[in-house]
Amino acid sequence: LQKLPREAGKLIVTDGVFSMSGDVCLLPEITELARQYNAAVMVDDAHGFGVLGRGGRGTADHFGLTDKTDIIMGTFSKSLASIGGFMAADQYVIDYVRHNSRPFIFSASIPPASAATALAALRVIKAHPELVERLRSLSDYMRAGLARRGVEIKASTTPIIPFYTYDM
């Protein structure tokens, strides 16, 4: 970033929650870096959407940085039990991706039943935000149960619970 001209287009891309470790990205530091170097920020929130933030709104919301995150993308296949995904960004970014992304151009639309499933799941999460907290509570319960049984687990604040199998 330091070597690029300030006016050059730059994009910092990160996972919101890393799928193998359950670690949450350092979004405050990333957005500050983006501010320093005039870069945009993109968060792939496949594992943060439905889990972190107010009512499961995701990693950017978790940190209060939704307004400093230029592109948020996620999947319906994890917390919404469907297929497909989403991208939230300024309209010109969405139009660019829609017209220039080969995988998007050559793929089929989400089936109506899958869209309805995702929408129904979103409505449940919105009506019952306590379910997100329950997921966190159940994750903590699982961690404690594994630890009591001597299973070595990696520290994580998300429902992703990495554990070591060694020679089991």
List the predicted regions and their residue ranges:
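Structural motif of enzymes handling amino- and sulfur-group chemistry
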Residues: 109-128, 134, 138-143, 147-148
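Active-site phosphate-binding strand-loop segment of PLP-dependent enzymes
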Residues: 1-43
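A short glycine-threonine-serine/GTX helix/turn-capping micro-motif
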Residues: 83, 101-110
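Conserved PLP-binding catalytic core of the aspartate aminotransferase-like
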Residues: 133-140, 147-168
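Short beta-strand
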Residues: 10, 73, 107-108, 151-157
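Active-site PLP attachment segment
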Residues: 61-96
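Short, small-residue-enriched loops and turns at beta-alpha junctions
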Residues: 17-21, 48-51, 104-105, 162-163
